[in-house]
Design a protein with these regions (language model features):
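Mature extracytoplasmic/periplasmic domains
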Residues: 57, 108-111, 261, 272-276, ...
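Extracytoplasmic "Venus flytrap"/periplasmic binding protein-like
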Residues: 57, 61-125, 157, 161-162, ...
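A structural signal for short loop-to-beta-strand junctions that line the ligand-binding cleft
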Residues: 81-82, 89-90, 119-157, 186-190, ...
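Hinge/lid segment of periplasmic solute-binding proteins
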Residues: 95-150, 174, 180, 200-203, ...
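Conserved C-terminal helix/tail region of periplasmic/extracytoplasmic solute-binding proteins
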Residues: 160, 336, 369-433
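Extracytoplasmic/periplasmic solute-binding protein
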Residues: 137-145, 150, 174-221, 264
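Glycine-centered hinge/linker elements that transmit conformational signals in sensory
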Residues: 179, 218-248
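Extracytoplasmic/periplasmic substrate-recognition and gating elements
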Residues: 60-61, 66, 84, 138, ...
Length: 433
């Protein structure tokens, strides 16, 4: 059975269980030493060292609260299992994606709009969380913490040596690719053997060429993917003219290695790939720019998503202690500890350093010209990454038409219940007017 269908089943169990047990099972209990225990479960095992440092500093400075932060492997599976058993942590730390949407839809999170720190979050990231709500809800249910960005990585030394300039429009981008190609250098490396890599340029193009609430508009029946994704599909295929021969024979690691060795001038992938690239070439001078998807620079949008955010469980018995933890986590010094370890962009307004590799994206970050990854709204069982790869492999004259038609039909198939729910809500709102 598909993962999302499983969780929808769990949501019904959770709703019944909460009604029957009064939201029992939360971790905020008194310890033997009299301190209130607050448990945070994070889905990022790669950040365990940063969280260990933060946990230690918190416990050294608080006499009445003991903080435990765990970052297990397979955290999402563990969390879903715990939710079924009604053994809830106090706070969970997850990304702004479809899992957040499902948990919120299951009514697991408490409204934290009365937390002062919410007022210090960059508006773009608050908007992203709102767009992840299946049905609009009053309140705020997550505290965005750290974000990532995806566009096009480029070899800064190669650009400088050849006098190439970072493009700001689609025309400038294709002209640059032609110039690089004529110089004997490969403009792009794609590495589409691993299907998930197809989503990197797809998302980066889509945020600039479509509205950020496209998926919700489709659910409401106001548009179709065949209409809105047409320019995205066209420009995805255009990338193939500037990439390695048969990109489906090379995976993510191959692409990172090739780019690290100077075999391509650019790599359309997120900043998360930089550590892998630098493991091959530690001295590589890497930059990253916003995908110039449009004919006018002013229409471009940076693809940025919430990599980590904190939500207080509705089952939490000690909201005051949970808030004290969130306040500490949102202190500038604490945020910097996390960013120094994990990189990325602070979701909080303030004077936080932007990684040098993302410097070209600074104007977009500082001016909130950002939109979430489209695939954060896609159900996993729809396998959009594989659909994109299949489309790109298809050389028939009507390949794009078939792809977009399938996108619409599969969307209805895998989102039937959600579409009905959204349209019922829409009708209720219209009837109430």
């Amino acid at each position: 059975m598909a993962k999302r269908n499983i969780f929808r089943g769990l949501a019904a169990v959770l709703a019944l269980g909460m009604c029957m047990t009064g939201l029992a099972g939360c971790g905020s209990e008194k310890r033997a030493d009299g301190k209130t225990e607050i448990e945070v479960v994070s889905y990022k095992p790669e950040a365990v060292k940063a969280f260990e440092k933060i946990e230690k500093r918190f416990n050294e400075t608080h006499d009445d609260i003991h903080l435990t932060i765990s970052s297990p492997n397979e955290a999402m599976t563990i969390l879903k299992t715990r939710f079924i058993r009604e053994y809830y942590p106090d706070i969970i730390a997850i990304g702004g994606d479809i899992n957040y949407s499902n948990f919120l839809d299951a009514d697991l999170f408490d409204d934290i709009s009365d937390l002062d720190e919410v007022q210090t979050v960059k508006q773009a990231y608050l908007d992203m969380d709102k767009e992840l709500e299946f049905i609009p809800k009053d309140g705020t249910y997550a505290l965005p913490y750290a974000a990532n960005a995806a566009g096009i990585l480029y070899n800064k030394d190669l650009f400088e040596e050849n006098g190439w300039k970072v493009p700001s429009t689609w025309q400038e981008f294709t002209t640059l690719c032609d110039e690089i190609k004529q110089s004997g250098t490969l403009p792009l490396y794609l590495g589409f053997k691993d299907t998930w890599t197809c989503l990197a340029p797809w998302n980066a193009l889509a945020v600039g060429l479509t509205d950020s609430d496209t998926c919700n508009q489709v659910n409401m029946g106001n548009t179709t993917f065949a209409r809105t994704y047409e320019p995205v599909a066209e420009k995805m295929r255009a990338l193939l003219d500037y990439a390695e021969k048969n990109p489906y024979a090379y995976g993510y690691n191959d692409a990172c290695t090739a780019f690290a060795r100077g075999q391509a001038a650019m790599y359309p992938i997120g900043s998360y790939a930089i550590p892998q690239i630098k493991s091959v070439n530690p001295d590589m001078n890497i930059g990253s720019f916003t995908f110039p998807a449009n004919d006018e620079e002013s229409d471009n949008v940076l693809n940025s998503g919430i990599d980590l955010q904190f939500s207080v469980m509705k089952a939490c018995k000690n909201k005051e202690a949970a808030y004290e933890v969130l306040k500490y986590l949102y202190d500038d010094e604490t945020i910097q500890i996390y960013l120094d370890d994990q990189g990325g962009i602070a979701c909080k307004d303030g004077d936080f350093a932007i990684p040098e590799t993302l410097e070209d994206m600074r104007p977009y970050i500082e001016n909130n010209r950002m939109a979430d990854y489209q695939d954060h709204h896609y159900p996993s069982e729809m396998s959009v990454d594989a659909m994109i790869q299949t489309f790109l492999l298809d050389t028939s004259d009507n390949a794009q038409e078939k792809f977009l038609k399938k996108f619409d039909s599969d969307w209805k198939r895998y989102n039937r219940d959600l579409i009905r729910k959204v349209q019922d809500y829409q009708k209720e709102q219209e009837d109430a007017q």
